[in-house]
């Protein structure tokens, strides 16, 4: 089962039942863990992402056989491309710019009473959706960020006409009328703005696939600070106190692979996240900065645009605490705890020297000796990665790597996330103690398709991950169980429990190497996600699952909190062992530079 196939079992939870074997229901209540670290989450907004490139190269091809909406454009490929561009433009227009975000964060910090409620945020989401629908019906010409040619204008009009028909037909199907008559189609063009608003409200509140995706997409129009507040609520409270002590949201950088630059550069995203890191209450937010070896290789070999910055310099500025001169004023750098890598976009964690090969077809410009990297793409990617690994090892900086067979341009590209490559990295003399989190563990894709999945777990990537993370007692190799939505489905959860039990039996010390994570806000797109919040906080669902696997209370507490303390280097012992080259020392220096108390970190000692 793939990473994103989530949460049907949420309905069982809403009924007061859990999607685990009946025997587990007789067990004692899971332990109440009030100190939690979310080691894998995201707070990105639309301006942070290459939405158009991601949709065009990954989402649309994957949806061609399953999406009714995409199927409407089989005969209109130009219209579908126009639609993707139009949606990307509008979502990014709705997202706040960097200075607006920072000003809003400052306002919330000055007066916490001004923080918006969930009801207020949902009402604003509806307003955004109504505005978008009114544009679709009445002002389609604003759906572009540039003047359109006649051909482009016709393609966009065809695209929006198909969208109008699709949305209107959905409303009719709700009332048992699957086909539109000629009169219906005529009425479609005569709707009033208030009728269009009603369609928007209806679709926003629906619990079907489109409704979920609409609500999820609208999250990307919010402020990052608000997304952090939502993640806090997902974990529940102890009185008024947050259960989640620390969240470590990851920035992703893969726009060079998709040929679609982010609206906010990585450097600008770092600046906003560093401001959130200065919050005075609630869970602390210290992120992972995105690093792309392709961007580094292009920079190192002078394939850059005016104003481009050295990616490694951006990484260092995000993590190292220093005072730098910016214009006529000084600024404090730092606030991040690690680096995020995303191999399935096109690179392996090591051994890329064979690239380009017959399977390497994206992006095409890389083969050019003038614009790209010519025939030495692979060796230059390896050099960029070695530069990152060396710096991270010397400074005890953790790396989070996407290690799931998902969300690459092709299946071959997704193979490049294989944990076998990380085993090779850690066997190199230079990197045996590199801090690495192999993210998205626990799906057992090659085993759950069988009736007796436990017999096939050694064929799964998870088996390789087990060897990597338990191979040495003094290493810093871990795996997070973020985005493990199968645990909420009755059938899949039983299979995952079986696989995890077999894994636990073979790797008895695995509890010392697993990390808890949510993959927020990605999980918000999943089936019946809103119902998940009603019966119990998300971490309690994960705790219940771990108990069903057979982990005891002490082991579960390690997974939910203690292991992340060691992986991230947050304890006083880490400070004493590595001195200024420890995360604990860097964060204490960061808080002191901002005249903030670091007493909250005592919970790690």
Residue map of PLM features:
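Active-site gating/metal-coordination segments in enzymes
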Residues: 144-150, 154, 159-163, 167-170, ...
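N-terminal export signals
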Residues: 5-26
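Divalent metal-dependent hydrolysis catalytic cores, especially in the metallo-beta-lactamase
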Residues: 41, 59-110, 118, 141, ...
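H/E-rich (His + Asp/Glu) clusters that bind or coordinate divalent metals
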Residues: 24-27, 433-605
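Long, low-complexity, polar/charged, intrinsically disordered or flexibly structured peripheral segments
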Residues: 150-237
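Well-ordered, non-membrane alpha-helical segments in soluble/globular domains
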Residues: 193, 197, 206-234, 259-276, ...
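Histidine-centered catalytic micro-motifs
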Residues: 36-46, 400-404, 438-441
């Amino acid at each position: 089962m793939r990473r994103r196939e989530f949460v049907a079992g949420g309905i069982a939870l809403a009924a007061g039942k859990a999607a685990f074997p009946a025997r587990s229901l007789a067990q004692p209540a899971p332990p109440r863990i009030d100190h939690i670290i979310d080691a894998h989450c995201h707070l990105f907004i639309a301006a942070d992402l290459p939405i158009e490139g991601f949709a065009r190269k990954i989402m649309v091809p994957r949806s061609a056989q399953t999406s009714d909406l995409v199927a409407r454009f089989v005969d209109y490929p130009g219209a579908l491309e126009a639609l993707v561009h139009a949606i990307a433009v509008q979502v990014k227009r709705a997202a706040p710019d960097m200075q607006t975000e920072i000003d809003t964060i400052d306002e919330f910090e000055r007066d916490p009473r001004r923080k918006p409620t969930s009801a207020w945020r949902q009402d604003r989401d509806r307003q955004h959706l109504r505005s978008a629908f009114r544009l679709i019906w009445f002002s389609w010409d604003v759906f572009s960020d540039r003047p359109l040619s006649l051909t482009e204008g016709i393609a966009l009009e065809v695209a929006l006409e198909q969208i109008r028909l699709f949305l209107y037909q959905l409303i009719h199907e709700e009332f048992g009328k699957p086909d539109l008559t000629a009169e219906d189609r005529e009425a479609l063009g005569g709707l009033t703005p208030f009728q269009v608003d009603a369609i928007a409200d209806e679709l926003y509140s629906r619990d079907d696939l489109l409704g979920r995706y609409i609500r999820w997409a609208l999250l990307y129009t919010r402020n990052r600070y608000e997304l952090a507040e939502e993640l806090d609520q997902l974990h529940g409270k102890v009185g008024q106190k947050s259960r989640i002590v620390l969240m470590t949201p990851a920035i992703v950088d893969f726009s060079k692979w998709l040929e679609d630059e982010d609206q906010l550069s990585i450097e600008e995203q770092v600046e906003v996240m560093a401001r959130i890191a200065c919050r005075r209450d609630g869970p602390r937010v210290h992120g992972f900065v995105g690093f792309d070896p392709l961007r580094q290789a292009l920079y190192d070999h002078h394939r850059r645009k005016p104003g481009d910055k050295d990616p490694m310099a951006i990484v260092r500025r995000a993590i190292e605490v220093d005072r730098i001169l910016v214009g006529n004023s000084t600024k404090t750098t730092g606030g991040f705890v690690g680096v995020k890598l995303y191999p399935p976009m096109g690179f392996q964690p090591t051994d890329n020297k064979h690239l380009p090969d017959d399977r390497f077809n994206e992006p095409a410009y890389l083969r050019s000796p003038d614009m790209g990297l010519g025939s030495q793409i692979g060796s230059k990617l390896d050099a960029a990665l070695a530069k990152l690994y060396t710096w991270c090892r010397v400074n005890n900086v953790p790396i989070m790597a996407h290690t799931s067979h998902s969300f690459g341009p092709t299946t071959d590209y997704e193979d490049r996330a294989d944990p076998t490559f990380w085993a090779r990295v850690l066997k190199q003399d230079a990197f045996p103690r590199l801090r690495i989190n192999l993210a998205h563990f626990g799906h057992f894709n090659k085993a759950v398709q069988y009736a007796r999945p436990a017999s096939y777990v050694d064929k799964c990537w998870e088996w390789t991950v087990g060897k990597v993370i338990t191979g040495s007692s003094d290493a810093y190799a871990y795996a997070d169980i973020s985005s493990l939505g199968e645990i909420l489905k009755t059938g899949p959860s039983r299979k995952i429990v079986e696989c995890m039990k077999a894994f636990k039996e073979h790797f008895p010390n695995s509890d010392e190497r697993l990390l808890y994570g949510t993959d927020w806000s990605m999980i918000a797109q999943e089936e019946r996600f809103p119902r998940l919040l009603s019966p119990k906080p998300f971490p309690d669902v994960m705790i219940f699952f771990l108990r069903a696997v057979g982990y005891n209370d002490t082991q579960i507490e390690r997974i939910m909190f203690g292991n992340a303390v060691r992986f991230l280097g947050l304890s006083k012992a880490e400070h004493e062992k590595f001195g200024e080259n420890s995360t604990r020392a860097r964060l204490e220096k960061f808080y002191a530079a901002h005249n903030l108390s670091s007493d909250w970190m005592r919970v790690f000692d």
